[in-house]
Amino acid sequence: MGVYTFVCRNNGGEWTAKQHSGEIEASAATPYELQRRLVAAASAADSRYGVQSSFSMVTPSSAVFQVIVGAVGGGAMMVSGGGGGGAAASGGAAAEAPKEEKKEEEKEESDDDMGFSLFD
C-alpha cells in the first residue's frame, strides 16, 4: 500500500501541488482537475489495486490532498476528510485497542413499581 500526501496551493488562478516527501508535482486550473492528475500520477506505479483519496481545504488558497493506493475496499479503511494527522506509510505495530469499561445494567422499572398498571 502506498500513501501519497500533497500540499496544494492556488496562485493566481492556477492550482499547484507538490508531494510532501517525494518528487511528484502537478498543476491544473481547478482543484478537481488537480486531484485527477495527482491520482493518475500516484496510481501509475501499480493500478491493479484500489485507490482512495481525500481532499481537505485548509484556507481558500491552500489544501492537503492524500492518495492511498492499495486501499482495502468496502469501508474497511477510513480516511480523515478534514482533520489533522496523517497515515503512517510504514507497517508499524498496530495500536492496542482501548479496554472496554464495565457498565452496570440499569433495571427497568415495571408498571407495578409506579403503583398503576396499563390495564387497570
Curated annotation (Swiss-Prot):
Note the superkingdom of the native organism. Answer: Eukaryota
Q: What post-translational modification information does the record give?
A: Phosphorylated.
- What are the boundaries of the region Disordered? 83-120
Keywords associated with the record: Phosphoprotein, Ribonucleoprotein, Ribosomal protein
User: Which example biological process does GO assign this protein?
Assistant: response to anoxia
Q: Name one GO molecular function term.
A: protein-containing complex binding
The family database entries (InterPro entries) matched by this protein are listed as:
Ribosomal_P1/P2, RPP3
Gene Ontology annotations for the cellular component aspect, listed alphabetically: cytosolic large ribosomal subunit
| Any single Pfam family the record assigns to this protein | Ribosomal_60s
Functional note:
Plays an important role in the elongation step of protein synthesis.
What family is it from?
A: Belongs to the eukaryotic ribosomal protein P1/P2 family.
Task: Give the protein name, as stated in the record.
Answer: Large ribosomal subunit protein P3
- Give the gene that encodes this protein: RPP3A
